[in-house]
């Protein structure tokens, strides 16, 4: 981290599958803001996956680890794909995204869900349902069933196999992610919906009690509601505009955010950031990445949607670089490109022209130039 200047160092890790393709476009966007808007960014590219494994025996080589350690933020592409079979499980696990989340204690994952009017006809949900949809799902990311021990698969005395996992949470693990939700809600519409399954799970009983206690003690000015996860999934599809900030545990957040992606038209549209605890100066380690996976079926074809990665840059501009005007500018440019008909295959209507990954990046860059030009005309 740069402790003596305002310059932000960003480690750019394309990863696997479509990761490098979409990250190439968000890299171009960051460079535009550095060159044209004076954003104080140093970009440092690094490798992850099969290629560095074949060269070094590690999917996460030492120079990539060094780049991420020194970075204020990480721009991540994707992990996984057929090539994972060429990497031994132990090596893959040692450099997994789960291990990175744990290493940097990236406990709060923020996933904005915004329904763009330009995509109303291509989204799976009805246009009337999508009107005014703009909320954020905050997923606890470093605890819960994905990290709980004991876990495993064993053979029982009668020959049957049994798989088991452990779901567990502590007061501090719940309260710190709930605090993130309440603080964010204060900057938005002032509403938090906490999602659990407290009617059957003890971890959810504790979750609800701790979220409620924190609310009563420090955030009584924020409206708090609770939903069971099954009802929350239904409400996201039925009336997503009712939500402002939703906070939930790891596994529920994983599922609900993919469900909510349909309000945006495609997983390819969704950005995210995973935040660590603030240091004494209030700075937080942050990993920015699109929500989509590595999509090995289309990797290398140049047709992936880069907007989830590009909009992750908008989140970076707002959260890490503290440049909300530039974040809004980028979001407006994406809106402008979409309104002009720019579409990759995943968001294109039948018969519509389909842009390549590179062409969509070009469309956003052209829109940035136009938006800035109009701002100067009216200055």
UniProtKB/Swiss-Prot annotation:
GO cellular component, one term: cytosol
Positions of NAD(+) binding: 293-305
Cofactor note (record): Binds 1 Mg(2+) or Mn(2+) ion per subunit.
Listed GO biological process terms: L-leucine biosynthetic process
Reactions catalysed, as given in the entry: (2R,3S)-3-isopropylmalate + NAD(+) = 4-methyl-2-oxopentanoate + CO2 + NADH
Entry cofactors: Mg(2+); Mn(2+)
Associated pathway: Amino-acid biosynthesis; L-leucine biosynthesis; L-leucine from 3-methyl-2-oxobutanoate: step 3/4
Binding-site residues for substrate, renumbered to this chain: 101, 111, 139, 230
Subcellular location(s) per record: Cytoplasm
PROSITE patterns: IDH_IMDH
Family as reported in the entry's similarity comment: Belongs to the isocitrate and isopropylmalate dehydrogenases family. LeuB type 1 subfamily.
Stored NCBIfam families: leuB
Official protein name in the record: 3-isopropylmalate dehydrogenase 1
Species of provenance: Bradyrhizobium diazoefficiens (strain JCM 10833 / BCRC 13528 / IAM 13628 / NBRC 14792 / USDA 110)
């Amino acid at each position: 981290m740069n402790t003596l200047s305002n310059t932000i160092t960003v480690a750019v890790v394309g990863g696997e599958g479509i990761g490098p393709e979409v990250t190439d476009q968000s890299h171009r966007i960051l460079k535009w803001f550095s060159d044209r808007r004076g954003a104080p960014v140093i970009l440092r590219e690094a490798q992850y996956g099969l290629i560095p494994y074949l060269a070094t025996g590690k999917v996460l080589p030492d120079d990539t680890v060094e780049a991420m350690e020194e970075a204020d933020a990480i721009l991540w592409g994707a992990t996984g794909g057929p090539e994972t079979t060429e990497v031994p499980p132990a090596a893959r696990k040692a450099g997994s995204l789960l291990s990175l989340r744990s290493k940097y204690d990236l406990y709060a994952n923020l996933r904005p869900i915004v329904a763009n009017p330009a995509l109303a006809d291509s989204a799976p949900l009805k246009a009337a349902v999508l009107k005014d949809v703009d909320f954020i799902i905050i997923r606890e990311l470093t605890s819960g069933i994905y990290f709980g021990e004991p876990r495993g698969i064993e053979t029982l005395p009668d020959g049957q196999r049994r798989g088991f996992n452990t779901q567990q949470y502590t007061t501090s693990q719940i309260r710190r992610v709930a605090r993130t939700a309440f603080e964010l809600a204060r900057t938005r519409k002032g509403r938090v919906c906490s999602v659990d399954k407290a009617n059957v799970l003890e971890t959810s009983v504790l979750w609800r009690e701790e979220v409620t206690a924190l609310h009563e003690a420090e955030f009584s000015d924020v409206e708090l509601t609770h939903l069971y996860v099954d009802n929350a999934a239904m409400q996201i599809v039925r009336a997503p505009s009712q939500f402002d900030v939703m906070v939930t545990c790891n596994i529920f957040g994983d599922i609900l955010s993919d469900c909510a992606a349909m309000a945006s038209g495609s997983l390819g549209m969704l950005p995210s950031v995973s935040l660590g605890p603030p240091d004494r100066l209030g700075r937080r380690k942050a990993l920015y990445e699109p929500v989509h996976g590595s999509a090995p079926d289309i990797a290398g074809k140049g047709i992936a949607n880069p907007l989830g990665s590009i909009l992750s840059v908008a989140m970076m501009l707002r959260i890490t670089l503290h440049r909300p005007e530039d974040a809004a500018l980028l979001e407006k440019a994406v809106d402008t490109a979409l309104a002009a008909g720019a579409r990759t295959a995943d968001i294109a209507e039948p018969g519509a022209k389909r842009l390549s990954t590179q062409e969509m990046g070009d469309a956003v860059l052209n829109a940035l130039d136009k938006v800035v030009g109009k701002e100067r005309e009216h200055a």
